[in-house]
Amino acid sequence: LKMNSKNIVMGDGNVDGSIMLIGEAPGLLEDKVGKPFQGDVGSLLNKMLLAINIKREKIYITYALNFRPPEDRKPLGHEIRKYSEFLKEHISIIDPKIIILMGSTAMEAVFRSNEKISETRGKWKEIILKNKTYPIMVTFSPSYLLRFPDKKKFSWEDLKNLRQKIRDLKINI
């Protein structure tokens, strides 16, 4: 992956933020700019966050894989596994109160699961890293929603679920 990419796309936003949003992998524009969720995908993400009164700069955003896959293909299982431990270390360093996984690659990297997002999205799960428990919710990625706009209604439900979790945990954003 590294040889195909121009930049490593690490993260962006508030490293002290209470929410960590993890996408799948950079695309062409993200690779060029060196920051996650750019262009139409970034615009949709910003709108999604603002719909529940969250400003993008208040949260921390990264990817499960930090290099762009060739021709924007879906990352392969061995590539996801290779970056999984790095991602988990990244989570421990940022130490958020809530984690949102956007897309199947992010879900597979954290949970080592090939479940369908349609079956797991919107449900709160947990992961324990270095003796710390993190609440996690999986939802569709903005790039998927741009390709399948009829799924936006499900993401809206997930966003409302996130908003409620923020209230329940008394997180100020």
Please place each PLM-identified region on the residue numbering:
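A polyanion-binding, active-site-adjacent surface
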Residues: 1-173
